[in-house]
Amino acid sequence: MSDVEIKVENIVASATLGKSLELPKIAPALENVEYNLEQFPGLVFKLKDPKTAALIFGSGKLVCTGAKCIEDSIKAIHMTVDKIRELDTEIPEEFEIKIQNIVASANLGKVLNLEAVALDLENTEYEPEQFPGLVYRLSDPKVVLLLFGSGKVVCTGAKTADQALLGVQKTKERLIELYLIEE
């Protein structure tokens, strides 16, 4: 595989707590909370360490965003649940945490002619009047890459960092095969 490094920029994880939550009771009892039902159907609870935001919904669903590694994402969810438990809200001990999306960035180290890439590479969308990047959809791994003329890449839709890395590596190799970049 080609030598390319990725940097995880954001991880989105979710948990279903199996119990509805009384947001009007929870919101005033927590610090660093934004709660305005007219603007958003849940409350936003910000943690400082790890620096994340947890979206808490009345249905008992929780979404954590902002972590740079899976461990921090899981830790943030557990910290959020512990804070809710401190408010005399019973939450089952066992609940499932799912990684929904990992966003990673990379640099191919080469300038890309996106018009040529759009013509030669399958499963792409490129509308420079709408967005400066080219959208490239891979089926294995099932990720979406945004390619920019500078050679910078953003990978989204991965469930693991390895999937994101593989997506970027396969893309670089395909671009080399099509003579769209040099090795």
UniProtKB/Swiss-Prot annotation:
Gene name, Swiss-Prot/TrEMBL: tbp
GO biological process: DNA-templated transcription initiation
A GO molecular-function descriptor: DNA binding
Sequence repeats: 8-84, 99-175
Protein keywords: DNA-binding, Repeat, Transcription, Transcription regulation
SUPFAM superfamilies: TATA-box binding protein-like
InterPro entries according to UniProt: TBP (IPR000814), TBP_archaea (IPR033711), TBP_CS (IPR030491), TBP_dom_sf (IPR012295)
Name of the protein: TATA-box-binding protein
